[in-house]
A protein has these predicted regions:
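Short alpha-helical segments used as structural interaction elements across diverse proteins
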Residues: 1, 101, 197-199, 245, ...
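Nucleotide-sugar donor-binding/catalytic module of glycosyltransferases
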Residues: 1-178, 182-189
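Membrane-interface aromatic/basic loop that binds lipid-linked glycans or pyrophosphate carriers
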Residues: 76, 213-259
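Generic structural signal for well-ordered, non-membrane alpha-helices
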Residues: 178-185, 205, 228, 232
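Long, charge-rich low-complexity segments
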Residues: 179-197, 248-259
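Secondary-structure edge/capping motif, primarily at the C-terminal ends of alpha-helices
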Residues: 187-190, 210-218
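Amphipathic alpha-helical repeat scaffolds of TPR domains
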Residues: 200-212
Length: 259
């Protein structure tokens, strides 16, 4: 977050983007994103992505793109637009766009309010992008155009995921839960039921991840704590769940008697 904040504070150009150093980008990504912004008069642009490991690439899951509108002059809904809170909900709901910053470009002028620049939260290892995007879009008129074409290649580090599974609850886990809880509290003023359902679903997934870890590691004390938190969340509406993910969730739900 420190590097991103310094970059934003020192930037003098018209556009801002944030690419992760270990990922790959398509040769035309920024030309296509900026062209889409200029043609459709939006404040930002977002493209689809593909995940890759040493074994090859894996497409970002195609979403229904619910709640976005076909942009002017677009073909087969290749480019679509929306703005404000609706845009943030698309990031949360559609897996191929995602609540991250690395597949997006912004006009520098929209990344500030009367209070100053929108800076990333310090000392947060997971969820800082989502929280930042909420500030930029929720309750504001910031517009975005979506390009369904995958132009960004995100490196999926499966070895790191395996490592964190072995070491139990991590800072990533705690940050993810905290960010969802804070966002849920923050967006109440918007009185948007669907947004709250989306964040509640993401909180459920974050807590369920910790509960599974505690169960596998026989960490009784933490299991009881997070199991109670999971029960307090209660029934949730699911979003963007694949068949395999649904089966796995239902198996764990039955095991933990959450149904």
């Amino acid at each position: 977050s420190a590097a991103r904040n310094t970059g934003l504070q020192e930037a003098r150009g018209e556009y801002i983007t944030y690419a992760d150093s270990d990922d790959l980008v398509g040769r035309t990504i920024y030309t296509e994103l900026i062209d889409a912004m200029e043609q459709n008069g939006t404040d930002s642009a977002c493209c689809s992505y593909e995940a890759f490991t040493g074994a090859g690439t894996e497409q970002g899951m195609a979403g229904s793109r619910t709640g976005v509108q076909k942009a002017a002059g677009s073909s087969r809904s290749r480019v679509e637009t929306c703005c404000g809170t609706e845009a943030f909900k698309v990031f949360l709901r559609e897996n191929n766009y995602a609540p991250v910053v690395w597949n997006k470009v912004f006009k520098r002028e929209v990344l500030k309010s009367a209070e100053g620049l929108f800076l990333f939260e310090k000392n947060t290892t997971l969820g800082e992008d989502e929280k930042w995007l909420a500030e930029v879009f929720c309750g504001r008129e910031t517009s975005v155009c979506f390009i369904a074409k995958p132009l960004y290649y995100w490196r999926r580090r499966d070895s790191s995921a395996t490592h964190t599974e072995k070491e139990g609850i991590t800072k990533n886990n705690l940050d993810s839960i905290r960010v969802q809880e804070e966002l849920l509290e923050t967006v109440k003023v918007l009185q948007d039921a669907e947004l709250e359902e989306l964040l509640k679903w993401r909180l459920y997934l974050a807590v369920m991840d910790v509960v599974r870890k505690c169960y596998k590691r026989r960490d009784t004390e933490n299991f009881r704590c997070y199991y109670q938190k999971l029960k307090q969340i209660g029934k949730v509406r699911t979003f963007g769940e694949s068949g395999t993910e649904k089966i796995r969730r239902l198996v764990w739900s039955v095991l933990f008697r959450l149904r």
